[in-house]
Design a protein with these regions (language model features):
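Flexible loop/N-cap segments at domain edges
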Residues: 223
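Acidic/polar low-complexity segments and flexible, solvent-exposed patches
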Residues: 2-8, 13-157, 162-205, 209, ...
Length: 262
C-alpha cells in the first residue's frame, strides 16, 4: 500500500497529483521540525497501544478524489489518510475510535452529511498485530518492515499544516506500525520515549534506531531497522525513502540508540 495524507489547509490539488505515493504528516523530524527535540533519557513503556476501530471509505481510480475526501475529513477535525491498496484503488481511513459503535456513529454522520458514501469498519482483529502472539512476533516484525519497504523511492519532504508533502522520518515509522495495528506516536521524540531500550547486539527487524543529527544529544532522526547493518528511513528534503548503513561514517557518529515496541 502507498499512503497519502493531506493537510486540511492544503490549497491546491495540483501538487498532490504530481506527488502520488507521498504522505503528509506534521513534521516530527527534518530541518524545520516544529516538534521539540527530546532528551536522551526515555520514559520506558512496556507495549504500544493497539489500533482500535477505524472507518474505511471510498474506492477511487483517481488520487484526486481521495485527496478531496481526505481534505473534507480533516476539515472536520478528524484524523484521516488515504492510500492505494493492492487492487490499485485509492481508499481513505478515518479515526481511531474506542468502539465499533462510535466508529459506526461517526461514519453514519459523515454519510448523512454526504461526505462519504459506503464504508466498512476496520476492527482491531483485522490488523497483523492482533494475529501475532509471542510465538509469532517475528512475523509481525517482518510485516512492519515489509510495509515500510513499500515506500522505498517515495520522496521525502518536510510536512507542514498548510502544504502537501511527503514522508518525514517519524511519519514513515508511525505509518508502518499503525498499518499493522500498533499505535506508535507521531514524533521521533515521542517514539524514543515510548520504546524499550535495546543494545546494538540485540537489534531485531522492526525495531527503531535513533540519531542526533543536529549537533546535540537529542533525538532528531529515526529509521526502521531491517536487519544486518541496514535501516530504512526518510533521509532529508530532496531525497527519497531509502535504506542506509548503520556503520556509515555519518550515522555511526550520530547514533543514540534503539527502541523495541514488541
Amino acid at each position: 500500500m502507498i499512503f497519502v495524507r493531506v493537510s486540511a489547509g492544503a490549497s491546491s490539488l495540483k501538487s498532490v497529483l504530481a506527488a502520488v505515493g507521498m504522505l503528509l504528516l506534521i513534521a516530527g523530524c527534518g530541518g524545520q521540525s516544529r516538534a521539540p527535540e527530546e532528551p536522551l533519557t526515555p520514559r520506558v513503556k512496556s507495549v504500544l497501544p493497539r489500533m482500535r476501530y477505524t472507518v474505511q471509505a471510498g474506492a477511487y481510480k483517481e488520487i484526486a478524489n481521495a485527496v478531496r475526501l481526505t481534505q473534507k475529513l480533516l476539515s472536520q477535525k478528524l484524523f484521516a489518510y488515504h492510500f492505494i491498496d493492492d487492487s490499485g484503488f485509492y481508499k481513505v481511513r478515518i479515526g481511531n475510535f474506542p468502539s465499533r459503535e462510535e466508529a459506526i456513529e461517526r461514519a453514519e454522520r459523515l454519510k448523512a452529511a454526504r461526505i462519504i458514501d459506503e464504508y466498512f469498519i476496520v476492527a482491531p482483529g483485522d490488523y497483523a498485530a492482533a494475529k501475532s502472539d509471542l510465538a509469532h512476533e517475528g512475523l509481525l516484525r517482518q510485516e512492519i518492515v515489509r510495509t515500510a519497504e513499500r515506500f522505498i523511492g517515495v520522496p521525502y519532504q518536510w510536512g507542514g499544516e498548510s502544504s502537501v508533502s511527503g514522508f518525514d522520518c517519524s511519519g514513515l515509522a508511525m505509518v508502518a506500525y499503525q498499518l499493522n495495528g500498533l499505535e506508535l506516536p507521531r514524533t521521533s521524540g515521542e517514539q524514543w520515549q515510548a520504546g524499550r531500550p535495546i543494545p546494538p547486539q540485540d537489534l531485531r527487524v522492526g525495531d527503531l534506531v535513533f540519531f542526533a543529527t543536529r549537533g546535540t544529544k537529542k533525538v532528531s532522526h529515526v529509521g526502521i531497522y531491517t536487519g544486518g547493518d541496514t535501516f530504512l528511513h526518510a533521509p532529508s528534503r530532496g531525497n527519497t525513502i531509502q535504506t542506509a548503513s548503520l556503520s556509515s561514517d555519518y550515522f555511526k557518529t550520530r547514533y543514540l540508540g534503539a527502541r523495541s515496541y514488541l
